[in-house]
């Protein structure tokens, strides 16, 4: 009597791949089928096949080699802000930079910050160091790498205005310095996303100023944002990019989008360009809400709003 061959399920294949990667980068956190809802500010998202936090550059390069060997796509995430992960999750490998990629070195004309450095902390620390310029990013969640990729900013400026150069880990595994031309900054756009590179560090141009003046400006901007945006809600930040000459939030507010709801996904009653998870929202609900808000602006004003939130996964 012959024994039927064991059937290796897709989930088991993922577990085996994760175990192999874990052996190659000892000490790093490697998880199979990790829910991305735990790692996004929306608190939404199905499982990543493999979720990994490499401890250093050598391990990060090894992750990239492993991905190439196995033909796996790689998605690098920062703090998980500005990100909507599908309910079916993300195939391949999701990389989140560990705290060892968060180093900061103060310079005479600015700062050299690791790609994993928290933007909010960098804003505060730059003020204490008497270096001004980052105040325009007050209240924006996420990491330096994520902020560079989307050219994060507010109505007072964008981080791309400050970037002198950045060190990138390219898909090939090579490390290269990118200048302002390669970064190609425009409103909520950079050359980083299309190139599929990982931001290792960035040099930002700042200017000296009295710390007390910077602290006062930071506090004014923080209070302004807290007064009109749902900063404590589960959100991914601004949903749509501002069209030329008008704020997306104003368009949606006038169109009557505030409070609009699909299941547990809702347009904030505080700011119409912020979508919030009321508790157990699914990505499908959030996507339907996005479509409805977009259709409303198009129908009422003929404005074709462009999504600012990045949607990934299945």
Predicted regions and their residues:
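Short loop/turn motifs at secondary-structure junctions and domain boundaries
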Residues: 158-160
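Short polybasic amphipathic segments
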Residues: 102-104, 164-168
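Short, basic and Ser/Thr-rich N-terminal targeting/leader segments
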Residues: 70, 77-79, 162, 233-234, ...
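Phosphate/pyrophosphate- and phosphate-bearing ligand-binding catalytic cores of soluble enzymes
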Residues: 2-6, 31-32, 40, 83, ...
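Beta-strand secondary-structure signal
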Residues: 51, 112, 165-167, 201-203
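Core subunits and conserved enzymes of cellular information-processing
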Residues: 127, 146-156, 176, 182, ...
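Anion-binding (especially nucleotide phosphate/pyrophosphate-binding) glycine-rich loop
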Residues: 10, 14-144, 152-154
